[in-house]
Curated annotation (Swiss-Prot):
Heme binds at Y32, C52, C55, H56. This is Cytochrome f. The keyword Membrane applies. It is found in: Plastid, Chloroplast thylakoid membrane. It comes from Chlamydomonas reinhardtii. The lineage of its organism: Eukaryota, Viridiplantae, Chlorophyta, core chlorophytes, Chlorophyceae. Belongs to the cytochrome f family. It is a single-pass membrane protein. Binds 1 heme group covalently. One of its GO terms (biological process) is photosynthesis. Coiled coil: none annotated. Gene3D superfamilies: 2.40.50.100, Cytochrome f large domain (2.60.40.830), Single helix bin (1.20.5.700). Its main location: plastid.
Length: 317
């Protein structure tokens, strides 16, 4: 089985498991990590943009916090925050309203990877909870993804990470490395094939007069908006269940004028930070140096006191 097929099957299986665990029906618009894994060999483009932004068009703030420096072969935590108003509801694939789901991709330096369960301290395990992080692909263990998961529970995530050991991995050095992170809340507006989801604005395809607005399905919802152009031709714009119409019959519209509101309440954001893989020998050398400086200072103080005593004795004599 090729790596691409393996990745697709594994990602799809994970999406189903996570959806069941979160009590969510995993629709294509929700399973955004699967889209990225299926369509992009690398989630970060050459211009620095993370590919999730291709489908999640709105921007929202995200935050990531990691230690300033770590020692080799050490487990540390990255804290991810996807802040949003927990009271808002998003449009689901069936047009109904529901809670937002969240997901993220974390691009670590080469050599860094998800910490094995037996290496993760109990304190960090408790913070991680039931989240299951997976590598982006079998060859890219330094890139981690998770989602969709319930936003109310996981708007803050803790990722246990194992730092590499340059003594064992010759491709790693004691340097400062960048870490890239992208996170989103809510469903996307565009599918990878370019088609719109029902979580976005729908615009008029032509200028003219709205001559009819017809319900597509009483059960599933949605509308057909018929627009008569100046030459008498009638074009029909189909609007799925989800967005609310903001036009009415008899109204004149321009091409690309919004026919609906913007139902999207989520958004995507990305951030980056840095981490230093610290050489233990440097720390030991620094401690020795500080100890030497401290000892020198103590000896100088003692020598000064001894000199003062000698001076005092000579004056008394």
């Amino acid at each position: 089985m090729s790596n691409q097929v393996f990745t697709t099957l594994r990602a799809a299986t994970l999406a189903v498991i996570l959806g069941m665990a979160g009590g969510l029906a995993v629709s294509p618009a929700q399973a955004y990590p699967v889209f990225a894994q299926q369509n992009y060999a690398n989630p970060r483009e050459a211009n620095g943009r993370i590919v999730c932004a291709n489908c999640h068009l709105a921007q929202k703030a995200v935050e990531i916090e990691v230690p300033q420096a770590v020692l080799p072969d050490t487990v540390f935590e990255a804290v991810i925050e996807l802040p949003y108003d927990k009271q808002v509801k998003q449009v689901l694939a069936n047009g109904k309203k529901g809670d937002l789901n969240v997901g993220m991709v974390l691009i670590l330096p080469e050599g860094f990877e998800l910490a094995p369960p037996d290496r993760v301290p109990a304190e960090i395990k408790e913070k991680v909870g039931n989240l299951y992080y997976q590598p982006y692909s079998p060859e890219q263990k330094n890139i981690l993804v998770v989602g969709p998961v319930p936003g109310k529970k996981y708007s803050e995530m803790v990722v246990p990470i194992l730092s590499p050991d340059p003594a064992k991995n010759k491709n790693v050095s004691y340097l400062k490395y960048p870490i890239y992170f992208g996170g989103n809340r809510g469903r996307g507006q565009v599918y990878p094939d370019g088609k719109k989801s029902n979580n976005t604005i729908y615009n008029a395809s032509a200028a003219g007069k709205i001559v009819a607005i017809t319900a597509l399905s009483e059960k599933k919802g949605g509308f057909e908006v018929s627009i008569e152009k100046a030459n008498g031709e009638v074009v029909v714009d189909k609007i799925p269940a989800g967005p609310d119409l903001i036009v009415k019959e008899g109204q004149t519209v321009q091409a690309d004028q919004p026919l609906t509101n913007n139902p999207n309440v989520g958004g995507f954001g990305q951030a980056e930070t840095e981490i230093v893989l610290q050489n233990p020998a440097r720390i030991q050398g620094l401690l020795v140096f500080f100890s030497f400086v401290l000892l020198t200072q103590v000896l100088l103080v003692l020598k000064k006191k001894q000199f003062e005593k000698v001076q005092l004795a000579e004056m008394n004599f």
